[in-house]
Curated annotation (Swiss-Prot):
GO terms for molecular function: cysteine synthase activity; O-acetylhomoserine aminocarboxypropyltransferase activity; pyridoxal phosphate binding. Its EC number is 2.5.1.-. This is Sulfhydrylase-like protein lolC1. It comes from Epichloe uncinata. The gene is lolC1. The keyword Transferase applies.
Length: 473
């Protein structure tokens, strides 16, 4: 029996008999990766154990040599986390997955698994601000160069690739610019050059709206904090190996898969990348997703289809409504026919156009900030994908440290407001917006008065914890 076919009834890595494997996405959200619990638990149990007992010395040796899969140490193997990994791999159409502590950790683990000192990779310029900073600063500290491509043209990606390029990175729908690149065209460029295509599919909602692997993408990453968790309770990330890239064809470019000590490609074939992420990079960096966090994300997944259906319905209605509002200068929503990437949305998105809208108010920066401050129900925060409606003014928060030129190139205008539409009754979302619009028109600045006491108390606590006096002994 090869390693790829080894099964287990104790850690969620077992193969489900084909005749019982649920075919529909909505059913897979609840059942893929489950394993029989010895005590009969219907929910996936939380295995809060730092380490796991070996049956024998020989058993421990097999696990550590990866000639048998099983639980060793929760830094990189845990039964609860394994269920999450298997479920997300199935939902995305991959062969294996590696769950990590956050979306940012998923980015770093992926980069470290493929690139090293002297290497480079190519990324779309239109990526999440945190990812951009990782690529521009952290990768550079590791001796890895990121080459940003600002255009949508696949030929420009091809021109940036050389013999030291390890992969191309892009996002399904860029955050916050709502840019959709042609996955299949960029994939063709990558595979012609002998490198994998990686896609951050956070906005694709674990395959509900988009399954990039079906369109030539080789590796998918997620911030599981967003729609996967869905309730703003848990931070997590995941890397899904599509099993589509042939590492065996490129031993000189990817020697890490042909190391004579580990022989990842020879032993694990299509799962080689996922095995490297979990049993080498995650093991060594400790960017671990805890078992309780994994269970929270699994609970979130169970309602993902129901939530995303409502997210998409509300977003479409809000986008149309905003477009007609006299105070709104513009709306960016990939579901609108006049959006520059609407054809890409029709090609790559199913079940709807996502739940993120960007728009600007007449009155620019000040009006946008005033509007956010005036909201009473909608929450101003950096998060996305919550069941609750969330809003952000990027120019004064996530993109404040970027130059005005950079913000303009990324499509982040001073008046931009990013809206993550929740699943509330749409009448209440509109009502909150209407009262905030009224306050903007009146030019009110003394807003959220009921929160002043809470804000002052929080400021006092923060000063005690993080201020200069906190360092005194």
């Amino acid at each position: 029996m090869t390693v790829d076919t080894i099964t287990s009834t104790s850690n969620g890595n077992q193969d489900v008999p084909k005749e019982f494997f649920p075919k529909e996405f909505e059913t897979q959200l609840l059942h893929v990766g489950r394993f029989p619990d010895i005590l009969g638990s219907c929910a996936v149990p939380v295995y809060s154990s730092a380490a796991f007992e070996f049956n024998s010395v020989a058993h421990g040796a097999r696990l550590l040599n990866l000639t048998q899969f099983g639980n060793i140490y929760s830094r990189f193997t845990n039964p609860t986390v394994n269920v999450l990994q298997n479920r997300l791999a199935g939902l995305e159409g991959g062969v294996a997955a590696c769950a990590v502590a956050s979306g940012s950790a998923a980015v770093v683990v992926t980069v470290m698994a493929l690139a090293g000192v002297g290497d480079n990779f190519v990324s779309s310029f239109h990526v999440h601000a945190g990812t951009f900073h990782q690529f521009e600063s952290l990768a550079k500290q590791m001796g890895i160069e990121c080459r940003f491509v600002k255009s949508r043209d696949p030929a420009d990606f091809a021109a940036a690739i050389d013999d030291k390029t390890k992969f191309v990175w892009l996002e399904t729908i860029s955050n916050p610019g709502n840019v959709i690149l042609d996955l299949e065209a960029v994939s063709m460029v990558c595979h012609t050059k002998g490198i994998p295509l990686i896609c951050d599919n956070t906005f694709g909602c674990a395959g509900y709206f988009c399954r990039p692997i079906n369109h030539g993408v080789d590796i998918v990453v997620h911030s599981a904090t967003k729609w996967i968790g869905g309730h703003g309770t848990t931070v997590g990330g995941v890397i899904v190996d599509g099993g589509t890239f042939d590492w065996g064809q490129h031993p000189d470019r990817f020697p890490q898969f042909h190391d004579p000590r580990t022989r990842l490609w020879e032993r694990f074939s299509r799962r080689a990348f996922a095995v490297r992420c979990q049993f080498e990079i995650l093991r060594d960096t400790g960017s671990t997703l805890s078992a309780p966090a994994a269970q929270q994300l699994l609970v979130g997944l169970e309602s993902l289809a129901v939530r995303c259906e409502r997210h998409a319905q509300n977003a479409a209605k809000i986008a149309d409504w905003l477009r007609e509002h006299p105070l709104v200068a513009w709306v960016s929503y990939v579901g609108h026919p006049n959006h520059p990437d609407h054809q890409g949305a029709l090609k790559y998105l199913k079940r709807g156009f996502g739940s993120v809208i960007c728009f600007g108010l007449r009155g620019g920066f000040e009006a946008g900030a005033l509007f956010c401050d005036a909201l009473k129900m909608v929450i101003t925060t950096t998060n996305l994908g919550d069941a609750k409606t969330l809003i952000l003014h990027p120019a004064s928060t996530t993109h404040e440290h970027f130059s005005s030129e950079h913000r303009a190139e990324a499509g982040v205008t001073d008046d931009m407001i990013r809206l993550s539409v929740g699943i509330e009754q749409i009448k209440d979302i509109k009502a909150d917006f209407e009262q905030a619009f009224e306050q903007v028109l009146r030019g009110k600045k003394s807003l959220r008065k009921p929160c002043i006491g809470k804000i002052l108390l929080q400021d006092e606590i923060n000063e005690d914890l993080f201020g200069p006096s906190a360092c005194r002994t």
